[in-house]
């Protein structure tokens, strides 16, 4: 054997790895199309978010939220607190309701940097990070920032809506108990006791409890804690709730503290008896929207005193569908036949400590439907219907975080439309979602936005107006701190609600 020849290796290296392709062709009705994938482009699907990010920066909302977060890491390899909370912010804004959806944010090469983040963390990092937050400290942290959002508005007359909503669960989660669940009877759930600022659709607080703790007695502690925290001078002009809240402990405490209330009553036997008696009388007054009203004073079983009760009725002029559930496996449907000399009425009963006329009371309670719309939006368009973990602590932390980010976005979209507050299903496609490419030249960063929305001209005009306002705020309010700038932003966003008045920030301490 010639020693100059190289020795043959007894173990060949095998096949060389194939080169990954980044282009393809597709035959379409318009002809052949060449498709290429660019994995390094500075693009984002949320191209109109920079204006929202400046809004957060000017008001100090995001910086304060990150700085106050009671989360500490001991490992040098752990993610930054700003990266973790920024990932939660982007996920909730995008309408996600599962931790797994966070992976879709990894394609965004623009907005994380604009938020001061170094990267988008993984879904597992978010789960582990939230697990490290002490529950009591975490809930206090979130409640502090919820209070910061609404505190400037509490000096105005306002209505406090109290209600609860059910979140069905499908696993072995902590607190997954069987309780009141109208849509999925028998399904374990969590109960969200919620306190809202009516008309503005702002969440003041949320308390996540096991599914069998849905009654008012489980939400009373949170209610009176909220009222104690905001101070007597800023209490609501009215406390409003549905049939579950019209009970003796809530009403007697409100009467003791001088807080006006308006609740719906259950149609108990005594209420029906009073209604039957009133039906024979003719002096029913107009209650608006086809309703008629008549008032009386009742002392129902369990009540400590007589109270003013308003009985409402409305004639039904539409076909009625009856459901016979004698055989649950096969319910029977039939249409009710109403004769020419017969009338069908819909009834309701309200209990109140207000002295207002019946027409005003009827409208005040109908306005509570806005609270139901907010629940629907939070559960179906935001994250209250998801982000479920085995422990109750992280469910509570995410519920508070979603409520906070919901408040931030709700107030921001009012800057875009001073007369309306569209829901997320409308505002996200118009004001958030658009393809944007970032370029840099001569030290200047440019974001080129391509919106596919049919009314993109409205978004452009709205953002030009918002950009002008924020520019004026930067130029004329350089000496203002974030709290004072937040008051200026709220005064602009809620100009119609405040009737053009400026909110007065608290005086700053003079320097010594």
Named regions from a protein language model:
Residues 19, 23, 410-440:
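Conserved nucleotidyltransferase catalytic core and NTase-mimicking acidic/glycine-rich helix/loop elements
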Residues 251-260:
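Short, surface-exposed basic-aromatic patches at helix termini and helix-loop junctions that form
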Residues 43, 74-83, 340-341, 389-398:
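Structural motif
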């Amino acid at each position: 054997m010639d020693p100059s020849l190289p020795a043959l290796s007894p173990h060949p290296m095998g096949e060389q790895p194939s080169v990954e392709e980044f282009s393809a062709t597709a035959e379409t009705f318009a002809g052949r199309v060449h498709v290429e994938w660019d994995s390094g482009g500075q693009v984002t699907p949320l191209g109109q978010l920079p204006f929202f990010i400046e809004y957060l920066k000017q008001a100090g909302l995001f910086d304060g939220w990150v700085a106050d977060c009671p989360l500490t890491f001991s490992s040098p390899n752990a993610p930054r607190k700003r990266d973790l909370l920024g990932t939660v912010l982007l996920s909730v804004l995008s309408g996600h309701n599962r931790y797994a959806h966070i992976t879709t944010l990894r394609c965004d090469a623009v907005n994380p940097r604009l938020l001061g983040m170094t990267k988008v963390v993984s879904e597992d990092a978010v789960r582990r990070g939230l697990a490290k937050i002490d529950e009591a400290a975490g809930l206090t942290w979130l409640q502090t920032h919820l209070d910061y959002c609404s505190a400037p508005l509490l000096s105005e007359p306002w209505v406090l809506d109290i209600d609860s909503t059910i979140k069905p669960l499908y696993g072995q989660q902590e607190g997954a108990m069987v309780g009141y669940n109208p849509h999925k009877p028998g399904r374990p759930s969590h109960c969200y006791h919620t306190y809202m600022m009516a008309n503005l659709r702002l969440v003041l607080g949320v308390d996540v409890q096991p599914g069998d703790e849905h009654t008012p007695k489980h939400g009373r502690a949170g209610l009176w804690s909220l009222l104690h925290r905001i101070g007597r001078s800023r209490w609501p002009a009215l406390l409003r709730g549905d049939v579950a809240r019209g009970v003796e402990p809530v009403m007697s405490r409100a009467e003791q503290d001088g807080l006006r209330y308006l609740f719906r009553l259950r149609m108990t036997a005594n209420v029906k008896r009073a209604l039957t008696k009133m039906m024979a009388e003719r002096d029913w007054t107009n209650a608006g929207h086809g309703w008629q009203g008549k008032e009386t004073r009742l002392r129902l079983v369990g009540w400590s005193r007589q109270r003013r009760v308003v009985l409402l009725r409305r004639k039904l002029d539409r076909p009625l569908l009856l459901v016979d559930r004698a055989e649950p496996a096969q319910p029977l449907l039939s249409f009710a036949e109403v004769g020419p000399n017969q009338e069908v009425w819909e009834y309701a009963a309200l209990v109140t400590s207000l002295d207002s006329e019946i027409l005003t009371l009827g409208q005040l309670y109908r306005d509570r439907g806005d609270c139901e719309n907010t629940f629907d939006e939070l559960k179906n368009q935001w994250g209250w219907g998801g982000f479920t973990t085995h422990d109750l602590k992280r469910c509570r932390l995410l519920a508070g975080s979603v409520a906070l980010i919901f408040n931030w976005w709700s107030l921001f979209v009012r800057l875009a439309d001073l007369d309306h507050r569209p829901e997320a299903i409308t505002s996200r496609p118009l004001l958030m979602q658009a393809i944007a490419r970032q370029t840099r030249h001569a030290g200047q960063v440019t974001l080129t936005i391509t919106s596919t929305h049919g009314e993109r001209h409205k978004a452009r005009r709205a953002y030009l107006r918002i950009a002008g306002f924020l520019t004026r705020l930067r130029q004329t309010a350089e000496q203002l701190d974030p709290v004072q700038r937040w008051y200026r932003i709220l005064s602009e966003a809620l100009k119609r609600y405040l009737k053009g008045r400026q909110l007065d920030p608290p005086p700053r301490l003079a320097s010594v």
